[in-house]
Curated annotation (Swiss-Prot):
Record organism: Methylobacterium sp. (strain 4-46)
Record-listed E.C. numbers: 4.2.1.20
Residues found modified as N6-(pyridoxal phosphate)lysine: K99
Protein's name in the database: Tryptophan synthase beta chain
Function comment: The beta subunit is responsible for the synthesis of L-tryptophan from indole and L-serine.
HAMAP family: Trp_synth_beta (MF_00133)
Swiss-Prot/TrEMBL keywords: Amino-acid biosynthesis, Aromatic amino acid biosynthesis, Lyase, Pyridoxal phosphate, Tryptophan biosynthesis
Length: 406
């Protein structure tokens, strides 16, 4: 495939058809098109409405707890002996991850559209918890679809969702993980078009979702620019974030895409190793195809069927990636790496011991690559890692893996 030309700006997408180059778009059943077009119109209006933006910013401040700190990880920086490492502390948000940034925007949009019933898919449960939280706050009905396998490995989050009044539907079809939960949510949406809003948790799905979720998450990168200028007097030299669908990464990256001197690294889940076949690294080990309403890189078998994704982290075992990431990969603006389960566990352990911060397994993938990147950089190199979630939800799983029953 010929490499696409480098654009004048990396921040103008998607086009009017919802495409980032050849990626993205709207591959949905005709029955869903009215929903999608209604959502696109409503989002365009809300985006241009200062009252909507003002309400969202007020909740981000007083309910979510933004801005999240930009924290110099002094001991970890000294340990690696290279770059000066900063954590963007998204794990300090209400509900414990970056997910709430996007959910707040979508729930306010659902209220504006007069939709009283909210559906969502979730993998690790963080998006489900954030959705259930905001539905409780605004008195909306909430139904969360979750793969039966993930229900088992994320019990604390399942209980949280139920405490918050959500109905959690375990999905028994397919691999019983995130992909299947998303399929079920889309089926629900088709059958309940009039009163239901589908709150997607990542930068995937049919247009306008990838752009809308990115816009709501871009608060991460906008704050990081301001905070780094205030603390160091200049912009960072590099950015690192983990990628499942890729919303935490897109939120950090997007405001910096046109600062071409800044190196940007996305870290996929390599599972047991990309060559093992047991991984979730769509860009490293996949090829372009269509899933969940958009064209992007996907894990596929020889017959073109969607392959099973594996990761130690329930939040990263999605067999695709957001279409904007697929495009950024092809135009060469972002470098995509991958971290194995074992590298991730070591980073999880090291961050806990060195900084007194127990990260979620998802951002521990990013930290695993920081361990390789940071030592190769000079001491004045400013590296920002998106610490996208806290590790509370992963403690039972990690304890079991390490043979230390809590």
């Amino acid at each position: 495939m010929n490499a696409p030309q480098t654009p004048n700006s990396f921040r103008t997408g998607p086009d009017e058809r919802g495409r980032f180059g050849i990626f993205g778009g709207r591959f949905v059943a005709e029955t869903l098109m009215p929903n999608i077009l209604e959502l696109e119109r409503a989002y365009a209006e809300a985006k241009a409405d200062p009252a909507f933006q003002g309400e969202m910013n007020a909740y981000l401040t007083h309910y979510v707890g933004r801005p999240s700190p930009l924290y110099f990880a002094e001991r970890l920086s000294a340990h690696f002996g290279g770059a000066k490492i900063y954590f963007k502390r998204e794990e300090l948000n209400h509900t414990g991850s970056h997910k709430v940034n996007n959910v707040l925007g979508q729930i306010l949009l659902a209220r504006r559209m007069g939709k009283p019933r909210i559906i969502a898919e979730t993998g690790a449960g963080q998006h489900g918890v954030a959705t259930a939280t905001l539905c409780a706050r605004f008195g909306l009905k909430c139904v969360v679809y979750m793969g039966a396998v993930d229900v088992e490995r994320q019990k604390p989050n399942v209980f949280r969702m139920k405490m918050l009044g959500a109905e959690v539907v375990p999905v028994q079809s397919g691999t019983r993980t995130l992909k299947d939960a998303m399929n079920e949510a889309l089926r629900d949406w088709v059958t309940n078009v009039a009163d239901t809003f589908y709150c997607i948790g990542t930068v995937a799905g049919p247009h306008p979702y990838p752009a809308m979720v990115r816009d709501f998450q871009s608060v991460i990168g906008r704050e990081t620019r301001e905070q780094m200028l205030a603390q160091e007097g200049r912009l960072p030299d590099s950015l690192v974030a983990c990628i499942g669908g890729g919303s935490n990464a897109m939120g950090l990256f997007h405001p910096f895409l046109d600062d071409r001197e800044i190196e940007i690294y996305g870290v996929e889940a390599a599972g047991h190793g990309v060559s093992s076949g047991l991984h979730a690294a769509s860009l490293t080990g996949g090829k372009p195809g269509v899933l969940h309403g958009n064209r992007t890189y996907l894990l596929m078998n020889e017959d073109g069927q969607i392959a099973d994704a594996h990761s130690i982290s329930a939040g990263l075992d999605y067999p695709g990636i957001g279409p904007e990431h697929a495009w950024l990969h092809e135009v060469g603006r972002v470098t995509y790496l991958s971290a194995t389960d074992s590298e991730t566990l070591e980073a999880f352990r090291l961050c806990s011991l060195m900084e007194g911060i127990i990260p979620a397994l998802e951002p521990a993938h990013a930290l695993a690559k920081v361990a390789e990147l940071a030592p190769t950089k000079p001491r004045d190199h400013l590296m920002v890692v998106n610490l996208s979630g806290r590790g509370d939800k992963d403690i039972p799983q990690v304890a079991e893996i390490l043979g230390d029953a809590l």
